[in-house]
Amino acid sequence: MNDLDDSTDEVMGKYTVIALFGLDNRDNGTYESGNSDTIMLASINNDSKEVKLVSVYRDTYLNVKDDTYAKMNSAYQRGGPKQAIEALNTNLDLKITKYVAVDFNALVETIDLIGGVDIDVTPQEVAKINEYSGEVAQVTGKKNTTLSGSGVLHLNGVQATAYARIRKLAGDDYKRTERQRTVIEAMITKVQKSGVTTINSVVDEVFDDISTNITPKQMLSLASHALSYKMVDNSGFPFELKTKNMGKRGDCVIPLDLETNVIELHEYLFGSDTYTPTDSVKEKSKQIINDTGYTKETEAVKIQ
């Protein structure tokens, strides 16, 4: 964890930031390793209960361990949630301590327990949901039901998880992270309509199916405020980016540059206009520039 200045510590102390990891593991309940294909930060304003979600693109080229630079999703593979959190904290000047990790089974089970979610889907997305839902059903042992129509549809756990996996349409992985945030928002909307009793019941049911360092008591405390949470915005990180093939590490998302993007992240998450990047972030930013040749002056990709 980086040595942040007092003013940054004070600002961040007014928020609770939880790291959310979605693992693309086929073995249910295996959380020790695996690439985290979903990496999300949930920032909760402790006073206003306003919530912002930020997806860290899985292919973002960052320092994942020691002096190794690679795709961010490999940090979890290299050391589980502890290493993934360490990578988030040191690259982004954060002080995350809490996390929740889910696999296919945990996500499907949670969505089914709250009675499904309503999501606005296009005909192209419906076709992909039907294409992907077979594998999700097979992995989780759930029934596969074909979805028809388009527009606002009611999705069960298998269908919503398949929707969150869609990548091979316009927008590629960037759009996929948006779909993942849409599912999270739809789940929050649904549980808020269900009431505290349902929320507590869901927590009791799924707690053993997830990986987290949040205690049951802390989880119930968070759940008790669920009716007060207000989803105000969501986005993806890096904000300014370009892709580049990095040899053995494959096609990576390059922040333009890391230092500039981290400043914007702190402003976005915490409303901070006084944050100054630590020397650690500045050094990592310079290393990424050296490795890629991309700077903040490089023309950024326009995300669809």
What positions do the PLM features span?
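Extracytoplasmic/secreted envelope proteins and their assembly/folding machinery
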Residues: 38, 69, 81-89, 104-108, ...
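Second-shell loop/turn segments in exported
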Residues: 27-30, 70-78, 93-98, 150, ...
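C-terminal solvent-exposed extensions
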Residues: 2-8, 15, 209-304
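Entry/capping segment at the start of metal-dependent catalytic domains
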Residues: 1-48, 221-224
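Flexible, solvent-exposed short loops/turns enriched in glycine
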Residues: 52-79, 123, 133
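Amphipathic, coiled-coil-like alpha-helical scaffolding segments used for oligomerization/assembly
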Residues: 78-142, 215, 219
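Flexible, polar/acidic helix-loop-strand segments at domain edges
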Residues: 9, 112-195
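Extracytoplasmic
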Residues: 13-16, 33-39, 48-56, 67, ...
